[in-house]
């Protein structure tokens, strides 16, 4: 039987072999930052939740602009992304909101925000420069704008899609590229990331089936972050599913370098997920540790006999080597 710890070890080791110095595919023009700095000041949010909800409202506004063909402005997003990318502490706090948002029926806006949060955490592990973090964050927020043009009758359908409906969804990378084309002169990585985020390392992705170094690293990061987000949240047609296949070393869909950073920065067990420990207790993941994807902090909910635990009891697996997760 293959153990999670073996899969993790193999994935991390293969990532190190691919860790030659790499940088984002697109150079970031100075004008991107100078214009953002001249933008009107954004009102300071009252809480981390307000930061998340402000982004959610912006994404809903962009969605409305696309559907109503009235256009949209990405300048406010630049400022919001800059604030988040420039504060690892804020990013970590927002990370905890990814479990609270993303399961609602209309998930498109929260999917984009959660993907940005995961992508930035991956890029921090890869030691991206501040300007590259900002550029990646904006690309991640806008990576799925092509989906905004897909009718809700398809997006929110609880049954399997018809071939025609599935094809409409499958065309969203091209739609995203075309939607972001007006910014290609100043920010070419936006359209590129939207177009490539479903391409896979082994060439099995779409729309072009390109592979390896043909795919920009922004798209590789966003693609993995987007996949993880979708797998760990409910959708109209299914419940959230296991993420084990993401780290299976037989799955060569994702860049080893990016996968390694993902595993070192984001726990195998998502925040809020239920896990069974080797002492047969059941708990919920309430905190994770960078670089320790198998050792989260768990709030115990049921004892070994299945009885609810009344008191607030948490176990930090990082400091308890005799305890480990046996199932999730």
Regions flagged by a language model, labelled:
Residues 1-75:
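Membrane-cytosol interface segments
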Residues 47-328:
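Histidine- and acidic-residue-rich, metal-dependent catalytic cores
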């Amino acid at each position: 039987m293959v153990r999670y710890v073996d899969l993790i070890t193999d994935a991390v080791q293969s990532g190190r072999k691919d860790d030659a110095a790499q940088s984002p595919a697109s150079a970031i023009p100075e004008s991107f930052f100078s214009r953002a700095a001249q933008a009107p000041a954004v009102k300071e949010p009252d809480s981390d939740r307000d930061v998340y909800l402000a982004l959610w409202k912006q994404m809903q506004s962009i969605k409305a602009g696309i559907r109503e063909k009235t256009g949209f402005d990405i300048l406010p997003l630049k400022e919001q992304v800059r604030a988040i990318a420039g504060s690892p502490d804020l990013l970590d706090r927002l990370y905890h909101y990814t479990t609270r948002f993303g399961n609602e029926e209309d998930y498109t806006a929260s999917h984009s925000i959660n993907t940005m949060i995961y992508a930035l955490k991956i890029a921090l592990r890869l030691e991206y420069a501040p300007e590259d973090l900002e550029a990646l964050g904006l690309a991640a927020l806008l990576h799925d704008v092509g989906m905004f043009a897909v009718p809700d009758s398809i997006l929110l359908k609880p049954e399997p899609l018809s071939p025609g409906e599935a094809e409409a969804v499958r065309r969203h990378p091209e739609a995203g590229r075309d939607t972001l084309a007006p910014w290609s002169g100043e920010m070419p990585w936006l359209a590129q990331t939207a177009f490539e985020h479903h391409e896979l390392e082994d060439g099995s992705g779409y729309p072009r089936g390109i592979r390896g170094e043909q795919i920009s690293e922004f798209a590789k990061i966003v693609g993995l972050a987007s996949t993880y987000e979708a797998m760990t949240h409910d959708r109209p047609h299914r419940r959230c599913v296991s993420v084990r296949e993401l780290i299976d070393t037989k799955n060569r869909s994702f860049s080893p370098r990016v996968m390694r950073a993902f595993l070192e920065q984001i726990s195998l067990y998502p925040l809020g997920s239920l896990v069974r420990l080797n002492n047969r207790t059941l708990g919920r993941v309430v905190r994770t540790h960078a670089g320790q994807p198998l050792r989260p902090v768990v709030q115990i909910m049921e004892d070994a006999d299945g009885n609810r635990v009344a008191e607030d009891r948490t176990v930090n697996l990082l400091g308890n080597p005799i305890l480990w997760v046996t199932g999730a």
